[in-house]
Amino acid sequence: MIDDNIENNEQTINDIAEEIVETANPEVTALKAEIEELKDKLIRTTAEIDNTRKRLEKARDEAKDYAIATFAKELLNVSDNLSRALAHKPANSDVEVTNIIAGVQMTKDELDKVFHKHHIEEIKPEIGSMFDYNLHNAIAQIEHPDHAPNSIITLMQSGYKIRDRLLRPATVQVVKKP
């Protein structure tokens, strides 16, 4: 009888425990679902913040790299003029002219150093190299039996780029098909 009583009490306790779990289970399930939803939102928000930070860093770096592009474009003509002056120096000249030419050369060299410091590269295609519309601007087509079609026959003006962005295309003449 005592054993039966104990069994009945244990059964009653188990029934009560199951009833409590069944009553609490929807609440626990709802809370677990809410926790999972909040974890998911946290992960997504963290990823979004990280992506935004990366985009801002990239934009900042690009702005820093390309901020001088407009100014550099204006200096390209200065570089061209210095090069033209050096290309037309007289063969026989007195000391004063020689000193002036040396000064022009030093100025050109210094400008080239500044260009290099700011990742500004000259685009100077070789004669015979193939025309690339991304880097070159063809102003004329000339028939020439010794060169392949679409190859560069004359460099009219050097081009320039800053890192991977084109500042000015190289102006060229290309060979056309006969």
From Swiss-Prot:
Keyword DNA repair (UniProt): no
Classification via InterPro entries: GrpE, GrpE_coiled_coil, GrpE_head
NCBIfam families: PRK14161.1
Chain's role: Participates actively in the response to hyperosmotic and heat shock by preventing the aggregation of stress-denatured proteins, in association with DnaK and GrpE. It is the nucleotide exchange factor for DnaK and may function as a thermosensor. Unfolded proteins bind initially to DnaJ; upon interaction with the DnaJ-bound protein, DnaK hydrolyzes its bound ATP, resulting in the formation of a stable complex. GrpE releases ADP from DnaK; ATP binding to DnaK triggers the release of the substrate protein, thus completing the reaction cycle.
Organism domain of life: Bacteria
Organism (species): Rickettsia africae (strain ESF-5)
Keyword terms: Chaperone, Cytoplasm, Stress response
Gene3D superfamilies documented for this protein: 3.90.20.20, Head domain of nucleotide exchange factor GrpE
Single GO BP term: protein folding
Protein name: Protein GrpE
